[in-house]
Amino acid sequence: MLYPKEFDVIVVGGGHAGTEAALAAARMGCQTLLLTHNIETLGQMSCNPSIGGIGKGHLVKEVDAMGGAMAAATDESGIQFRILNSSKGPAVRATRAQADRVLYRKAIRTRLENQPNLMLFQQAVDDLMVEGDRVVGAMTQVGIAFRARAVVLTAGTFLDGKIHVGLDNYTGGRAGDPAAVSLSARLKDLKLPQGRLKTGTPPRIDGRTIDFSVMEEQPGDLDPVPVFSFLGRPEQHPQQLPCWITHTNSRTHDIIRGGLDRSPMYTGVIEGVGPRYCPSIEDKIHRFATKESHQIFLEPEGLTTNEFYPNGISTSLPFDVQLELVHSIRGMENAHILRPGYAIEYDYFDPRGLKASLESKAISGLFFAGQINGTTGYEEAAAQGLLAGINAGCYVRERDAWTPRRDQAYLGVLVDDLITRGVTEPYRMFTSRAEFRLSLREDNADMRLTEVGRELGVVDDARWDAFNRKRDAVSRETERLKSTWVNPAMLPGEDAVPLLGKPIEREYSLADLLRRPEVRYEALMALQGGRHAPETPLDAEPMLAEQIREQIEIGIKYHGYIARQAAEVDKLEANESTRLPEGLDYTEVRGLGFEVSQKLNQHRPETLGQASRISGVTPAAISLLLVHLKKKGLGRTRAESGAPSGNSEEAA
């Protein structure tokens, strides 16, 4: 039957990509439908119970800066928070949280059920409705047809998913959930380029059977307790719990080696490529044969369960081998396994077949987000979901798509890497992937993206008000520090030495003093009984005041580096955003070699910058393309196209 209501946007899948996509489209005012095979598993954390980490936390902050749900849901469900790399520079500091699975799922579902313009429907999708080269809706497993102007596919690991435990396997999207076999077959019928990837998960352990007394306790950060959302507060966090650390040993490694003849990975049963940066324990033992032990983190799954996630022993070995290897680990000699570990193989679709908006190049109105694009991780999925949801909304409203730049957001780095380079293994975000990471910090994600989000219609009034207060306070206080001067008479040696290590010998601005590595803003403001502090607090809200202080300090201390990076960006921007005509035949570009023209015709890059990052496309080829565009009067910049861009960097 044809469902009586037509929607603007349909989102298929209710994981981390799907929920952010649906919420974003609905915030833009689009009539949105989220189709999921099970409403009870919306926002499910299918693997480890954690959010964030190096590179990943940056993505979560960016999603939050644009009104997304992941950071706020983590603040409401996080049972341990830590700042990683806290002793290093601000570019690589990252927030990580352990989350209570049940509370996280509840927080996401509450947002979905209370979001205007968004409806939920429980049915697996078996087919896409396509007319010509345009998607017009989706068909469920019982034949209900939903029509829409745009469809966002966020199928995760469900497309023709196959679960492996030892040499036994069965179809499934994850343990306990069916695979999307019919939808996978339909996508293959559409001739979209695809491949096979693999991921895995460890056995879960009953905490009552673990001896924590022989393990190392790993508490979270308590002074202060971090928050994920720019609008978050520590009071939102539930009870905080520690994690625990133990290690594998030589006996563990011998047990694993003895079971490799029944491993689906090492007997050729699994064809998909697994994630390089989250390898299985059998992969670790094989690849790092001389390493005597591997660290294992015992992570609590929640406040109302005894279940623990042993991070570090993901495996698809037979259950008897899993049991033996777990019992060989210190503190887990008597451990009871609640759920066996497994590997899952699934279909993904080559992201080089997508535009920078995440819309398919082959089928108009069809967007892809999450693991279906070859990525791994909740955070990468959520970021893509946000972008796909926004651009589905732009497509419906006939507005230019928003395509974040590499110098603007980790989301821009992520998508650009996917659509220009493709994937041969599950893609994970790291800070090292970003050329401009000093400008792409966690702390300034709102300064980079909230204004863009407001223009696009995904940032609400409360967030916009807090952002403006923060931006104005940072600007005002930075100017005050630059224009307030002190000299040796005003700052005698007995006051200067404890802070600076020596007396001042000439006049300095407060900004000059703060620029010194050893000087902190709070210490400078407390100098001489607070004589140099602002007349009024930075903000009445303590968490916002702390964010303002952090922005001021980083902006002043790293001003020279940030300015140099901004100059590099300006130099690259002219050619980076030059648009390439859709119908350009690269074989007609004079001087372009056959291999290069073939690759460009195959990948159809949207901009000169994207073209430059395709393997085999040389700087000389880019120069020839530029000459061709100028001769023909073709090509236009992002600014000329009218797409929202936002600020690449505020005063940090």
From Swiss-Prot:
Amino-acid positions noted as binding NAD(+) in the UniProt annotation, renumbered to this chain: 274-288
GO terms under biological process: tRNA methylation; tRNA wobble uridine modification
Disulfide bonds: none
One Pfam family this sequence matches: GIDA
GO CC terms of this entry: cytosol
Obligatory cofactor(s): FAD
InterPro entries listed in its UniProt record: FAD/NAD-bd_sf, GIDA_C_N, MnmG, MnmG-rel, MnmG-rel_CS, MnmG_C, MnmG_C_subdom, MnmG_C_subdom_sf
Keywords from the named record: Cytoplasm, FAD, Flavoprotein, NAD, tRNA processing
Keyword Flavoprotein: yes
Binding site for FAD: 13-18
Similarity comment: family membership: Belongs to the MnmG family.
Subunit composition and interactions: Homodimer. Heterotetramer of two MnmE and two MnmG subunits.
Function description: NAD-binding protein involved in the addition of a carboxymethylaminomethyl (cmnm) group at the wobble position (U34) of certain tRNAs, forming tRNA-cmnm(5)s(2)U34.
UniProt name for this protein: tRNA uridine 5-carboxymethylaminomethyl modification enzyme MnmG
Upper classification of the organism: Bacteria, Pseudomonadati, Pseudomonadota, Betaproteobacteria, Burkholderiales
